[in-house]
């Protein structure tokens, strides 16, 4: 049962790290080695503590990457304009190859609202 939980946690963490573009191959290899080791199948306090530290560390990296990305998006929304209409117009002006149907004012407003909410502004 412990192995199944560890496999699921490892898969979730690896997926999160890949989507956050903050993945280092060595970290994933270390997690996999830890998963495969005999210590995981019968963890004692030291191994459980080590696992907890690795998971917390990985989670903090993902959280930091998401917050950093939201900060960039929030800043971009502020630079582009205060209203979704202004932001949409500026994006379409900057990227003439983009079709108007690709960028809806509602979408721009939602993206900016989410970025501001995550970033805390």
From Swiss-Prot:
Post-translational modification Histidine amide, affected residues: 119
Annotated signal sequence range: 1-20
Pyrrolidone carboxylic acid modified-residue sites: 107
Disulphide-bonded residues: 77-112
Record keywords: Amidation, Antibiotic, Antimicrobial, Bromination, Cytolysis, Disulfide bond, Fungicide, Hemolysis, Pyrrolidone carboxylic acid, Signal
Taxonomy, superkingdom: Eukaryota
Propeptide boundaries: 21-50, 83-106
Modified residues annotated as 6'-bromotryptophan in this record: 51, 59
BP GO annotations: defense response to bacterium; defense response to fungus; killing of cells of another organism
Subunit text: Heterodimer of a light and a heavy chain, probably disulfide-linked.
Protein name per Swiss-Prot or TrEMBL: Centrocin 2
Species for this entry: Echinus esculentus (Sea urchin)
């Amino acid at each position: 049962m412990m192995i199944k939980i560890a496999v699921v946690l490892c898969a979730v963490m690896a997926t999160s790290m890949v989507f956050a573009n903050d993945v280092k191959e060595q970290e994933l290899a270390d997690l996999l080695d830890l998963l495969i080791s005999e210590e995981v199948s019968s963890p004692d306090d030291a191994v459980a503590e080590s696992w907890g530290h690795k998971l917390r560390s990985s989670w903090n990296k993902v959280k930091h990457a998401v917050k950093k990305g939201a900060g960039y998006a929030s800043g971009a929304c502020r630079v582009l304009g205060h209203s979704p209409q202004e932001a949409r117009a500026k994006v379409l002006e900057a990227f003439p190859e983009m079709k108007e149907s690709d960028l809806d004012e509602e979408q721009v407003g939602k993206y900016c609202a989410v970025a501001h909410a995550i970033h805390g502004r």
